[in-house]
From Swiss-Prot:
It is found in: Cytoplasm. Residues 193-207, 391-415, 495-504, 686-711, 836-854 have a biased composition (Polar residues). It comes from Chaetomium globosum (strain ATCC 6205 / CBS 148.51 / DSM 1962 / NBRC 6347 / NRRL 1970) (Soil fungus). This is Protein SIP5. Belongs to the SIP5 family. Residues 1-77, 168-226, 381-415, 463-521, 542-608, 623-746, 778-854 are annotated as: Disordered. Residues 44-53 have a biased composition (Gly residues). PANTHER family: PROTEIN SIP5. It comes from the Eukaryota.
Length: 887
């Protein structure tokens, strides 16, 4: 601002003055600068504490933490990329006898074997290298085709000239003359050479044989090992035992002189001309493969490194009777069995390897003594002093060599077990056991803590309530000091909180509670109580589950039975049919009944389109079943198959209202009145005569024998159904009651007008009876004349005879329409003006008396004389009371 100096300028001036001033002032200035430097400004402090606000001090964005699965996936991806790069580098720079030290990618699973150990075993020629597998191989291939296939190049046609870089050129190991060099170049390899020629060629070409000890000792000056340490490393690396090869004292790797030919043939041709197939991956490899120690089956190295022990697991499903049973399995620990052979499933899977009779590529620089030890440990075919380099003598698969016919021990030095290439299996097993033990210990501690805490809470709960009950205000027993400790100054005696006096008294009165023995006993008791409560809870839960299952099964069974009953009802309804005739419910109904009676299935005509007949459908099946239980007719009786009632009274006793008299159809024996048939639905009234009219229906019904079934009233109905309920109901005892037209399921409007026309009373105790009959009874009751029961019966019979003769013209159409007519109908007609309605004793005939057992059937005229009575159907029932009276 104007000429004012800024902070920077002042600092600069101060510093310049300090430089040009005296030493005292300079030291003072330096102290000020250091103190200012030590002080922290407010902005810096806010930045440190996160109090600053502004764009430069904004909070960093939230970074999502990587999950374990994502980290594992990234690690596997890094390993895959590194493995691909290492494979490419190793295949270009390293090889062992024409094979490689890295996998060829046959399996894509993670390579969890120990790669340094496998590499060392392959360089030592104890395990076959990773040969390149061929998908297709033909024995007729030429050398250029074999070389191209072995190098992973496209196989050229047989007649095509191979490129110059495809066929290798031999490099002279020692300077030779031009003639010998040209001779070697002009020599054409012949596959059918004799062993002598091959040996001569091997002797003339020292580069194709093993390197001499002099050449092997050439890099002695560059060796990092001292002579003594190198000898120890060679001895340990030579492998006096199975675990002799160690990575800590591994000798130095050297590259043998490069020679692309073996016995004058290219290396690839020598390896693949007698190729064999791996039985596991089905790829073609050179015949120098690993062989199982147990069954001597070939297996490539890439398949061998995939076989391993199973993960640690509990010994479930193992054979406990096995003599070689692992004691760890009995203890319930985690176990991990050795890998089994994929061919014969023998445990302790291992392989042996016989290398080719030459060495190329990498090797270890070892001394002569180590060479002798290694040659003693190795088989004769893989010895460094092997004289023959012919593959026909060294190859175990070409038939000339004798195949091993017995297994090799798992402890043999030449056997490489799967545990050898995965030495960390024991560490994994111990780690799994330790992890399981930690989990078990944590669970035990958690449960113990829960028991202890729960026990202490239970003890405190019991002690609180116990003290409150013993020393509280509600206790009848006083406290030892005469003071009620439950009534404190706050008056919270019911709160359950102990007072200080109670605590002191309990501590003084029970000094042993704080001891360890008492606490231990309390914990044990609490544990037992908790276990008992848990057992009871589990038992109750199991019982509830059982009851629930039982109820569920019962509901299923009930539904099933209900469904079966409905099916049976439907089948019975179908079997009965729409018309009930001679084959209907009782099999003895008349022709008119079979013609005019329609059951309640809804097939008949409905008067006024009434919906009340729908209620009769349910009763049809029950009535059909009830009628099947009716008593069969006596075959000795006369008549055309007419049902007659079986009297249960004595022969001399008169018939009462309880005598079931069937007048044309079967009915239940419990019914007070017989019915001609059982139509559950409305009848064709226009086809019926006066027998089915309102008059006959009313006169056929006895007074008081029917009460209105209020549960069958249907407010949806409109119209009138007459005589629709003449059949037996579901209980088989409401036949007469259902015949009452006033008890019909139809509503009562439109019925009064019809009742007035026909002269029927609808109200009072005489509902459903003719007005003329009611008037006759009233007059008879006023006259007071009575008579004996016998004379009344005789008068009724005579009345029937006379009235039947006079009204024969009216009865016959009724019989034709309904098939039967009850006797009380004729009685009702005669009572109107006949003097026989009053007997000699002055007793009045009423409807409560039972009708005589006289049946008037179809086409049967009334009897006119005593001689003609014998010709009437059912004459025994009609004449028998007359004979008794006359006698």
């Amino acid at each position: 601002m104007g000429n004012s100096n800024t902070k920077e300028s002042r600092a600069g001036d101060g510093s310049s003055r300090a430089h040009h001033g005296d030493p005292g002032s300079a030291s003072l200035q330096s102290d000020r600068v250091s103190s200012r430097r030590n002080r922290v400004s407010r902005g810096d402090l806010g930045g440190i504490l996160g109090l600053g606000t502004g764009a430069s001090q904004s909070e960093p964005p939230y970074e999502r933490r990587e999950t374990k699965q994502e980290r594992e996936a990234r690690r596997l991806e890094r390993e895959r990329v590194a493995r691909i790069a290492e494979r490419e580098r190793s295949m270009k720079e390293e090889h062992v006898d024409g094979g490689y030290l890295v996998t060829m990618g046959t399996y894509t699973s993670p390579e969890d074997f120990n790669k340094p150990i496998v590499r060392q075993l392959q360089i030592e020629r104890k395990v076959a290298p990773f040969w390149r597998g061929l998908n297709d191989f033909d024995d007729q291939w030429t050398e250029p085709q074999i070389i191209a296939a072995a190098r992973g190049l496209p196989v050229p046609p047989a007649d095509q000239i191979p490129p110059e870089d495809l066929i290798p050129r031999p490099l002279p190991a020692n300077p030779r003359t031009e003639g010998s060099s040209n001779l070697d170049n002009l020599t054409i390899p012949i596959t059918g050479r004799s062993p002598s020629t091959a040996s001569e060629h091997a002797s003339s070409n020292p580069g194709s044989a093993l390197p001499s000890p002099v050449s092997a000792q050439a890099p002695r000056a560059n060796s990092p090992f001292k002579p003594r340490g190198k000898a120890i490393a060679a001895v340990l690396g030579g492998g006096g035992s199975r675990n002799g090869s160690t990575t800590e004292l591994m000798p130095r790797e050297i590259n043998l002189p490069h020679d692309p030919f073996v016995n004058g043939q290219p290396l690839e041709v020598f390896l693949y001309k007698n190729a064999t197939e791996c039985p596991i991956c089905f790829l073609t490899f050179p015949p120098y493969l690993n062989h199982t120690r147990c069954c001597d089956q070939p297996i490539c190295s890439e398949c061998f490194v995939q076989i391993k022990r199973p993960d640690p697991h509990f010994p479930e499903g193992h054979n406990e009777n096995d003599p070689n049973h692992n004691p760890e399995e009995t203890a319930g620990l985690l176990v991990s069995e050795p890998a089994c052979c994929p061919y014969c499933t023998q445990p302790d899977f291992g392989v042996t390897y016989e290398p080719p009779p030459f060495r190329r590529g990498l090797s270890y620089s070892i001394s002569l003594t180590a060479v002798g030890a290694a040659s003693a440990a190795m088989s004769s075919s893989s010895s460094v002093n092997s004289a023959s380099l012919s593959p026909t003598n060294a190859s175990p698969s070409n038939g000339t060599g004798r195949r091993r016919n017995q297994s090799v021990s798992a402890s043999s030095p030449s056997v490489i077990l799967t545990d050898r290439i995965r030495p960390e299996w024991a560490t994994k097993l111990q780690a799994a056991r330790a992890h399981l033990a930690r989990r078990a210990a944590a669970a035990t501690a958690l449960h113990t803590a829960a028991f202890i805490v729960g026990g202490s809470e239970n003890r405190a709960f019991r002690s609180r309530f116990g003290r409150r009950n013993n020393g509280g205000s509600g206790s009848a027993l006083p406290s030892p000091g005469g003071v009620n400790h439950g009534e404190g100054e706050n008056g919270d005696s019911g709160s359950g909180t102990p007072s200080q006096n109670d605590m002191d008294q309990n501590s003084r009165g029970d000094p042993g509670r704080g001891r360890s023995g008492g606490n231990h006993r309390d914990r044990l008791e609490d544990l037992e109580e908790m276990m008992l409560a848990e057992a009871v809870r589990l038992s109750l839960a199991a019982e509830e589950e059982r009851k629930r299952k039982v109820s569920k099964e019962e509901r299923k069974e009930a539904k099933k039975r209900e469904k079966e009953e409905r099916k049976a009802a439907k089948a019975a309804a179908k079997q009965v049919g729409p018309y009930e005739g001679a084959s209907g419910r009782s099999g003895h109904s008349s022709a008119s009944g079979s013609t005019l009676s329609l059951p309640g299935f809804g097939f008949g005509r409905k008067r006024g389109n009434s919906a009340a007949s729908n209620l009769r459908i349910e009763a049809s099946v029950a009535s059909a079943i009830a009628t099947t239980e009716s008593p069969e007719a006596n075959p000795k009786e006369k008549g055309k198959g007419v049902d007659r009632a079986v009297s249960t009274h004595a022969e001399g006793a008169p018939a009462t209202a309880t005598d079931p008299a069937v007048l044309g159809g079967s009915a239940s024996t419990s019914s007070p009145r017989p019915v001609p048939h059982l139509p559950a639905g409305p009848s064709h009234l226009r086809q019926m005569s006066n027998a089915s009219s309102v008059t006959s229906s009313i006169l056929d019904s006895r007074h008081g024998s029917y009460t209105s079934p209020t549960h069958l009233q249907d407010p949806r109905s409109s119209g009138l159904s007459l005589g629709s309920r003449s059949g037996a109901s579901e209980d088989g005892g409401d036949a007469d009651r259902d015949r009452d037209p006033c008890a019909s399921t139809e509503p009562m409007f439109n019925f009064r007008s019809l009742a007035q026309v026909v002269g029927v009373s609808l109200d009072g105790e005489n509902a459903g009876r003719r007005l003329s009959l009611i008037e006759a009874e009233r007059r008879a009751r006023e006259s007071g004349e009575t008579g004996s029961q016998d004379s009344a019966d005789f008068g009724e019979v005579e009345t029937i005879k006379t009235d039947t003769a006079t009204d024969h013209a009216d009865v016959k159409p009724q019989a034709e329409a309904s098939g039967s007519l009850s006797v009380d109908t004729a009685m009702g007609r005669h009572i109107k003006g006949s003097p026989i309605a009053q007997n000699g004793s002055g007793e009045v005939e009423s409807d409560s008396l039972s009708p005589p057992t006289v049946t008037i059937t179809l086409e049967t005229p009334a009897t006119a004389s005593a001689n003609d009575e014998l010709k009437q159907l059912g004459s025994e029932a009609a004449v028998e009371p007359v004979h008794r009276l006359t006698e």
